[in-house]
Design a protein with these regions (language model features):
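Short, hydrophobic secondary-structure boundary micro-motifs
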Residues: 118-122, 162, 184, 218-221
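Hydrophobic alpha-helical connector segments
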Residues: 74, 88-117, 168-171, 200
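Short coil/turn segments at alpha/beta junctions that flank glycine-rich nucleotide-binding fingerprints
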Residues: 39-43, 93, 114, 156-157
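C-terminal peripheral helix-coil segments that are non-catalytic and often amphipathic
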Residues: 2-12, 140-155, 180, 184-239
Length: 239
């Protein structure tokens, strides 16, 4: 599902076509590209449109990104938060249910606040596998990590009996559907940020309420799960 280790090569020079100033031209390009992809779709967006929005000549874009596919690859790299957290949570000790809650909450929130609707990214990745070589592999790793957490929860007695692999696929598919509905209903980052945390909590609550062996423990699981999320965020390096 989420993003990948396809960083663009670092280049020097930054000729610009306007007086706009940015301490990080690459980030500015990604932000404007995401806005255009969201507004009119990936296929309809051209590299020249992105360059114009950023204030660069199209030829100058090549100092940063050589193609629209390279921009998409960089955006994909930004969507690995869920997988990174899942791998960390598998290394933790103690109750499993809060770790599963933290993973599911983070997955929904990350999908909702990513620069691009996951479905748009998936279409681009499947159409050009040579450009997005890590996309399917990361998706497999994410499902496997979710299945491992589920299996641990079943073994510990915290979760009801379930098929970990099938349930992991279902949970992640529901998360993707939830983010798509949020993306479909808005076209600006501010609205996404305002709604993503609430949606993430609702979806994680829904998942855990159906999985917990003791449904009455949901409030405690939520509190402990959110503590994991906060700890993870505090450990993240500053941008």
């Amino acid at each position: 599902m989420t993003n990948r280790e396809l960083a663009s090569p670092k280049r020097t020079g930054r000729p610009r076509n306007s007086g706009r100033d940015s301490a990080n031209p690459r980030e500015e390009i990604l932000k404007e590209a995401s806005r255009l992809f969201t507004a009119q779709g990936v296929a309809a967006t051209t590299i020249s449109q992105i360059a114009e929005c950023v204030g660069l000549r199209q030829s100058s874009m090549y100092y940063y990104y050589k193609s629209k596919e390279e921009i998409l690859s960089a955006l994909m790299e930004k969507n690995r938060e869920s997988l990174t957290l899942a791998e960390k949570l598998l290394e933790e000790d103690g109750p499993v249910a809060p770790r599963l809650y933290a993973f599911l909450y983070t997955d929904v929130r990350q999908l909702c606040t990513a620069p691009l609707d996951f479905y748009e990214l998936e279409v681009a990745a499947l159409a050009q596998p040579q450009v997005f070589a890590g996309f399917e592999e990361d998706g497999d790793k994410l499902r496997d990590a979710a299945a491992q957490l589920l299996a641990l929860g079943v073994d510990s007695g915290e979760l009801r009996q379930t098929d970990p692999a099938a349930t992991a696929l279902m949970l992640l598919s529901l998360n993707e559907g939830a983010q798509h509905r949020l993306w479909h209903g808005r076209r600006d980052e501010e609205k996404a940020s305002a709604n993503s945390a609430a949606l993430a909590e609702s979806v994680a609550d829904y998942h855990l309420s159906s999985l917990l062996a003791d449904a009455s423990s949901l409030a405690a699981v939520r509190e402990a799960g959110r503590a994991f999320v906060t700890e993870y965020e505090d450990d993240e390096p500053a941008a």
